[in-house]
Amino acid sequence: MKSFILTLFCFISVWTSVQAQQENTQLDKPLKLKRRDAKGVEDLKFKPEEITHINFSRRRLTEFPIELLKCTNIEELTLSFNEIQSIPEGIYSLKKLKRLLISNNKISSIPEGLGSLTELEILDISSNPVNTVPDFSALQKLHVLNISSLQLTTIPKSILGLESLNDLNISNLQLTSFPDLSQLKNLHSLGIDGSRLTELPAGIEKLILLRTFTASNNALTSIPKAVLALPALRNLTLSKNAITALPIDIKNAETLFSLDISGNKLTTVPKELFSLARLQNLNLSENQIRVLPNDIPENSVLKELDLSYNALTLLPQTLWKCKSLTNLSLESNLLTTLPNGISALQDLNTFNIGKNPFESIPIKEIMTMSSLRDIGIVSRKEIERRREEGKLQKAKETSVKPELKNGK
């Protein structure tokens, strides 16, 4: 009975390998028993050798629970979003550790012992004031590494040699120069946001397995042809850069499924962008686009198109040829009217044309579109009218208050 009570009220998940096989439980779905008024660290004293999964995230911990070092069979340890300042060198004793998540703490240094955890598959030490990391060359099973938002000024060579890596996030570092990434040939996902780049790092063209690439919040002025030619690329995010034009070679991005190029300096877009065979999500918001191509092709497979916060004054009627569209945003442009034929978009669910100076809207045609669930049609003129009405109403209320106080 005593063992049952202790197990019921513990913070952590206690699984034996036999239980895990019986329940067919995956590593990324640990059982979580939450009781905020319990002392989670105390639970570590209960058969620590049987513990394989621990989640102490968001527990306001200021120190690494030293009792954890007794959990020699632990496979997953999560200590994210606390106020831990250091990791003990003794962490090397957790030889079976496969997943270590210690992001968003106050850790200033990573012990050398962490580099000897050869079973590690996933490591997240992001968002800590760390300025150096140990030699990771022994972590040959590591396939996910997040070292974003650290104080690193260089990326260690030991990381650049980890051919097992599939997912690497090196965003928001303090790099003075960017290394060649060509050795990381097995990368599927790469994040280099907020790196003050004016051009992409060398070796990108060698990452032939890369599927997701994000390089937002940089100073890029163009998209290199080599990136568009990556044979496996599906998701490309280049938002908040200084890109002024899209190359005609965009037509070579035949595998692209999602493209986010919002927050740049585009004034036009090539028609080839709309004919990409697999492109379904396109975000062109917050640019300076004045016109769209007149000859948008009928074979477009776009489902989501965001053109909000641009400078469009007219839309081509051929836009309605994008018959796969389910979400379309034209909010905050300079549109005064819409071309006829919008009812051809029979799959459209969300349509936002608010904050435009419309003089006329084909409202009857829009209302025949049975698939529409969300329509935003408030114009700039309407907003200004309501604002003026609000000011007038406020003035009236102010003028009658003295009378109300006097009981008149």
Region spans (language model):
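Leucine-rich repeat
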Residues: 48-49, 69-73, 92-97, 115-120, ...
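The feature encodes a structural signal of leucine-rich repeats
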Residues: 42, 64-67, 87-90, 110-113, ...
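Leucine-rich solenoid repeat scaffolds
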Residues: 339-408
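LRR N-terminal entry segment and analogous cap-like coil->beta motifs
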Residues: 29-34, 44-85
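Conserved hydrophobic beta-strand positions in leucine-rich repeat
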Residues: 31-33, 52-56, 77-79, 97-102, ...
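Solenoidal tandem-repeat scaffolds enriched in leucines and small polar residues
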Residues: 132, 143-199, 203-222, 234-245
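Bacterial Sec-dependent N-terminal signal peptides
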Residues: 1-25
